Amino acid sequence: MIDVNTVVEKFKSRQALIGIVGLGYVGLPLMLRYNAIGFDVLGIDIDDVKVDKLNAGQCYIEHIPQAKIAKARASGFEATTDFSRVSECDALILCVPTPLNKYREPDMSFVINTTDALKPYLRVGQVVSLESTTYPGTTEEELLPRVQEGGLVVGRDIYLVYSPEREDPGNPNFETRTIPKVIGGHTPQCLEVGIALYEQAIDRVVPVSSTKAAEMTKLLENIHRAVNIGLVNEMKIVADRMGIDIFEVVDAAATKPFGFTPYYPGPGLGGHCIPIDPFYLTWKAREYGLHTRFIELSGEVNQAMPEYVLGKLMDGLNEAGRALKGSRVLVLGIAYKKNVDDMRESPSVEIMELIEAKGGMVAYSDPHVPVFPKMREHHFELSSEPLTAENLARFDAVVLATDHDKFDYELIKAEAKLVVDSRGKYRSPAAHIIKA
């Protein structure tokens, strides 16, 4: 047993060693924030390549400047694959993936395997915080028994909290420090220690009554967005059939100063959270005999968008007297959103696969993704095509899937034979531009 005040004071005095487990789009910015305010930080990851790059002062995420990594390294940050060093840490913040399996059900293997790897090295006085997006009950059902397996009692010897990550890669308006941090603890003592951990690094910490409430908060945030995007994607289809520009309509509706929040249609949902989180809740709800029909319907609409874009591409080619089979198609933007290199759950990749499955010859251009990376479910041996007049002329059609600012939209409009615009970038009508 340890006095909770002693643990709290260690964080308030910034004498604690912060362990970040999982050094990706969530863990790396968090590491940089704690390092910047004077904490010693140890990064832990199973990926040797990532660890070696970080220890060499290099970065593998485009929107994080390499100079920041080099500065952190010079001021004491270290990365390792050695989980035995967990015992050195006063805080362990878990930032690992929570994807879906092939049945569209939660894949908790990363969380469970990581916690199992930590177990032998947990000790009195530590706080364990899970940040991965997950279903309500994960912290209590999966982490709690594992943390206590060696005899430590949560709330007395060791502290357990859930604080969902809210990173938005590439967003220039918000950073780790300025995004409020929701947190729930397994006990009041856990919450007290968790607040002490995060209030050093985050401007505003928002405590809630339990880890379940914190887990549900994250799901509500993202399901709210997914459902509203599903709504506007469905309205896009109706508006298109009626000859109405949905982007014009959304912009006009957004002038109402109350009761309306603008959401814009696109080729489908991307990123690690928005396309996945609804399935976490629908899966857990079934345990309680409930069916989340509204959420599931919006998911069906969003999942159908790549097929909708494909249909628009085929229509455009048919109008030009061509079939998709044998046509050369350039997909513009394969990251899941503009101005980043993050390809997690990108609908662009599904569009590429659909084009290929129909016999089209697919290529891509993305200034943020020079080479198609290794992905768990998708595989293309491709590099980004230069966006030049000569190159655009080689393709029978281009599909604007992600509207990066670095694209030359006037060049695309002038040189492409057919443009399928899934992002509403081209508002003025043109014979060779099809809105999708």
From Swiss-Prot:
Location, primary (coarse class): membrane
Matching Pfam families: UDPG_MGDP_dh, UDPG_MGDP_dh_C, UDPG_MGDP_dh_N
PANTHER family, per database record: UDP-N-ACETYL-D-MANNOSAMINE DEHYDROGENASE
Protein name according to UniProt: UDP-N-acetyl-D-glucosamine 6-dehydrogenase
Keywords, sorted A to Z: Cell wall biogenesis/degradation, Lipopolysaccharide biosynthesis, Membrane, NAD, Oxidoreductase, Transmembrane, Transmembrane helix
Listed GO CC annotations: membrane
Cofactor(s), by name: K(+); NH4(+)
Organism of provenance: Pseudomonas aeruginosa (strain ATCC 15692 / DSM 22644 / CIP 104116 / JCM 14847 / LMG 12228 / 1C / PRS 101 / PAO1)
Pathway stated in the Swiss-Prot or TrEMBL entry: Bacterial outer membrane biogenesis; LPS O-antigen biosynthesis
Lineage: Bacteria, Pseudomonadati, Pseudomonadota, Gammaproteobacteria, Pseudomonadales
Job of this protein: Plays a role in the biosynthesis of B-band O antigen for serotype O5.
